[in-house]
Curated annotation (Swiss-Prot):
Record's catalysed reaction(s): (2R,3S)-3-isopropylmalate = (2S)-2-isopropylmalate
Annotated pathway: Amino-acid biosynthesis; L-leucine biosynthesis; L-leucine from 3-methyl-2-oxobutanoate: step 2/4
Gene3D superfamilies xref list: Aconitase, domain 3
Protein name as annotated: 3-isopropylmalate dehydratase large subunit
Gene field: leuC
MF GO annotations: 3-isopropylmalate dehydratase activity; 4 iron, 4 sulfur cluster binding; metal ion binding
Annotated EC: 4.2.1.33
Cofactor info, note text: Binds 1 [4Fe-4S] cluster per subunit.
Keyword list, A-Z: 4Fe-4S, Amino-acid biosynthesis, Branched-chain amino acid biosynthesis, Iron, Iron-sulfur, Leucine biosynthesis, Lyase, Metal-binding
Length: 414
């Protein structure tokens, strides 16, 4: 029987490809944002008439430098808006709409889809079982123009999630655990297929975090095999019905088992995503700023757990909290999470990448220590090259903001 990767491409191609095959594929969705869109559209212009193969399959979002913090960023947005209007693209999200990957996940991605976008964290949509893969501007421009592009079929790698999360452990810790085990390039050339033993013990928000950070693992894609959680999510969020196919497990080049109950809160210490340590190993490190958000951990459950901790008092470190989309912002507002965070002293704004890439809304200064729920912590990632970034789950981040230092979040959840 086919693996999930083989099943998807079998349906697309009419035959079962082998790992390493170079194939042309018609994508179900193509996306770009403000930081990559300028280059995508420049390439399209160089190809002659600016046109897209199917405007219903194109998603555009302003997220990286939104709202524009510089004159150049504003000029780029004007340029992209002009083309969006001329092309009559209906799925355009201007300032405040949210981060491209979250928008694709919550509004468009479906199991079995093939999704290409001009950003490395396109993998996020694998949370619902889509083959989602980041590409460069030239390849995305070709996909937009021609309605197809090439892809190298990756080798399938199986990961089994056994058991349930203990308190204070989240999808971020699973991602960091995998990075510790396999390294930052451990899944190069692989499509990681994740099977969950107890589906409802591994919610969609946590799946999205793991899929998102598969980029840091080097994976071509990471897909959670659709199950009852996938079906419920699509029905609840979009009113869309989906029935997973009845597939027997295929053949994998390798496999790995994650025992969820044995995990504890983890961090990736400076300056590498695979420099992973238990929170208890770095307890007491003083923190200047905390960032809760990004396409990795800016979802509703992330804000819920942060609010549970931050209702205890005022923050001792600067805390910037940014929901990943307008939809999440509105829900967090209605549920009172944003009220709790602002009363605790956090700065909260709408969906934008913000400080994740060191662009704006909280760039780190020289010597500053940041605890961030985002996905990268290399030198200078969030600002000054002399700053230090610890990647953590939202509970650990919120507890660090509350105490002004890295602490184990579990006592704050009792």
């Amino acid at each position: 029987m086919p693996t999930w990767t083989e099943y998807i491409f079998q349906k697309k191609l009419g035959h079962t490809p082998s790992p390493g095959d170079v194939v042309e594929v018609v994508p179900d969705l193509v996306g770009f944002h403000d930081l990559t869109g300028y280059h995508v559209l420049e390439v399209l212009e160089s190809m002659g008439k600016v046109e897209v193969f199917d405007k219903e399959r194109v998603v555009v979002a302003f997220d990286h430098l939104s709202p524009p913090p510089t004159q150049r960023a504003a000029e780029i947005m004007v340029y992209i808006r002009k083309h969006v209007k001329a092309l009559e693209l209906p799925h355009f999200y201007d300032v405040g709409g949210g981060i491209l990957h979250q928008i694709i996940l919550e509004k468009y991605a479906m199991p079995e889809y093939v999704i290409f976008a001009a950003d490395s964290h396109t993998n996020t949509a694998g949370a619902v079982g889509a083959f989602a893969h980041g590409m460069g501007a030239t390849d995305i421009a070709a996909a937009l123009k021609l309605g197809k592009t090439w892809v190298v079929i990756p080798a399938p790698f199986r990961v089994d999630m056994k058991g349930e999360f203990p308190p204070g452990v989240m999808g971020k810790d699973v991602a960091l655990h995998l990075l510790k085990q396999f390294g930052a390039e451990g899944f190069n050339g692989y499509s990681v297929e994740v099977f969950v033993e107890i589906p409802k013990a591994f919610p969609m928000d946590d799946r999205a975090t793991v899929a998102n950070m598969s980029t840091e693992m080097g994976a071509d894609a990471l897909m959670f095999i659709p199950d009852v959680v996938t079906v419920d999510y699509l029905q609840r969020e979009r009113g869309v019905s989906y029935k997973p196919p009845d597939l027997q497990p295929g053949r994998y080049v390798d496999k790995y088992v994650v025992e969820l109950s044995k995990l504890e809160p983890l961090v990736a210490a400076p300056y590498s995503v695979d420099n992973v340590k238990a929170v208890r190993e770095v307890e007491g490190v003083e923190v200047d700023q905390v960032f809760i958000g990004s396409c990795t951990n800016g979802r509703l459950s992330d804000f819920e757990i942060a609010a549970r901790i931050l209702r205890r008092g005022r923050v001792k470190s600067r805390c910037i909290a940014i929901p990943a989309s307008y939809t999440i912002f509105r829900k967090a507002l209605e549920l009172g999470y944003i009220d709790i965070l602002t009363k605790a002293g956090c700065v909260v704004t709408y969906g934008t990448c913000g400080p994740c890439l060191g662009g704006h809304f909280g760039v780190a200064g020289p010597g500053e220590v940041v605890v961030s729920t985002s996905n990268r912590n290399f030198k200078g990632r969030m600002g000054h090259p002399d700053s230090k970034v610890y990647l953590a789950n939202p509970a650990t981040a919120a507890a660090a903001a509350l105490e002004g230092k890295i602490v184990d979040p579990r006592p704050y959840l009792l």
